[in-house]
Each structure stands twice: as structure tokens, then as C-alpha cells.
Amino acid sequence: MKILITGAKGQLGREISECFERGYTELGCPAILKEKNDIHLIDIDELDISKLSDVIALFEKERFDAVINCAAFTNVNLCETERELAFRANALGPRNLAIAAEKIGAKLIHVSTDYVFAGNGSTPYVEWDACEPQSAYGHTKYLGEEYIKQFSTKYFIVRTAWLYGYYGKNFVKTMINIAKEKGACKVVCDQIGNPTNAADLAHHLIKLLDTEEYGVYHGTGEGECSWYEFTKEIVSLSGINATVSPCTTDEYPTPAKRPAYSSLENMMFKTTVGNEFRPWREALKVFIENNSN
């Protein structure tokens, strides 16, 4: 299979490309990894996905069988002021990929976010719940989803949350560094979600390539917690002698509104290709053990 990975230099894009290179994921070996695949890695410096003519030209030249879109503008606060940049990356780019993929009959896997929801509920969101984004980031990601639905027939939209991995910057690495350097950290306790190991998500995205179970998916670590609880577990598993204190969202204001409760239920994975996301504590433990070596 000829596969294009966009956003290939990001933490998820690199995780996926590494899986193809070594022939297995941290969770096993999806069937497609046993095949001989032609993997193309592209990032913003090689292709601006907001330019439709460039995207179509590449797709018509290379004739990809599938595209995994990991490209996004994920600085949630900066999206509030850089709205055009956010729109180009998170909405226009996915639209262009959908148009180009449809022209050549390619599958499109697109990574989205829990921020498409209002975050004011008390039970986990399922894939068919109504979207109501509260931030510029959430709005642009939602628009990206809608464009894909409009222009593609062979799509997988996979919403994830609280992603961390071996590559690039992320919350887990940041908290470990702060705890080591300062011996204390203060973290919000009234925002609830699902910590997700990029290795788990990569495994599931690769599995989707072998199916035609198109639609919207949720892909997150099993179980939910607050950022405060997440940080306490990070510090504890890392064996760092540091104090973790709770604070409220009101005590820690940010330019972009965060969802108070955005826990996702992986209903589609559970009922179609199979849900193998690890409990978030288990996945975090493995990550920290591997990352400390």
C-alpha cells in the first residue's frame, strides 16, 4: 500500500512512521505492517496542505492508496489570535486532502480532537453526540471534520485527547521537567479528560488502513482523570520527590476556553475493528519506563 503521512515530524506522525519502519507497534503487529508498504513522509516545509492545487498535483502524481493526516496547528491559546493560520491548518488543509484523496480514490484518516465538544456534560461523549466547540482551535478542527464529510466518501475521523508520546514536546515531559527542576507544580483539578499514549493511537490508526469501516471514531486511553490526577501519577511513576497541588481553572486563566469535561467513549472502535487502548495509567507507566531508559 502506498501511504502518505502528513505532519510527519510531529509526535504522532513520527510514532506512526516508526511503526512502519520497524514493522510493529508497541501493542502488536496489525496485518498491514506485515506487508511491503511504500511510505511517504511530508511536513509543512515540503507541502502546504492549505494550497489545494499543490495537494492535488502531488496526489495525482503519486496516486496514494491512503493518507494519514497528522498535520495541525495545536497551540490552543495562539489559535485565538492567529485565527487565519489555525483555519488554514485545521480546516482548509483537511478539506484539500479530502478533495484530493477523493479524486484518486484514496482512504483518508484524519486526527481530530475532544475540543469539538462543549465540555459541559458529566458522561463521556460518544461519536454521534452534537459538537459545540468553545474555542478557535475547537472551531477550526470541527470545520475540518465537516469539510472531510462533505468532500470524501472514504474517511476515518479519529478524535483523540491529551496526547503524549516519545517524540516532541508534550504535557508528560513538561511536568517531569518542572517537577525535577522546581520540586513542585500546580495543576488544574476541574478539567476532566482521557490521557492518550501516542503509541496506542498509532496502533489503531494503522489498523484502520486495513478496513472499510468508515466514519467518526474516538480514540483515547481508557478511563478518565483531571490534569491534577494525571500529574500526580506522572510524578509518582517517575519517582520524583515533588509536591503536586490542585488549582481551579479560574485560578489559572488562559486565552482559550478549555472544556471542563471532555472525556470520550471509544464506541466505534469497540464495535468495529476492536478497542485495544490501554487503561491510561498502564499506558503512562510503560511510557515513563521506556522514556527513562
Go through each PLM region and give its residues.
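N-terminal Rossmann NAD(P)H-binding glycine-rich loop of SDR-like oxidoreductase domains
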Residues: 1-26
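Rossmann-fold cofactor-recognition segment
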Residues: 38-53
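NAD(P)H-binding glycine-rich loop region in Rossmannoid oxidoreductase-like domains
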Residues: 49-89
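Catalytic helix-loop patch of NAD(P)-dependent Rossmann-fold dehydrogenases
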Residues: 88, 92-96, 103, 116-158, ...
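NAD(P)-dependent short-chain dehydrogenase/reductase
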Residues: 146-193, 199-200
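Glycine-rich Rossmann NAD(P)(H)-binding loop
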Residues: 187-192, 217-224, 272
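Mid/C-terminal beta-alpha module of Rossmann-like enzyme folds, strongest
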Residues: 204, 211-255, 260, 267
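Amphipathic terminal alpha-helices
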Residues: 280-293
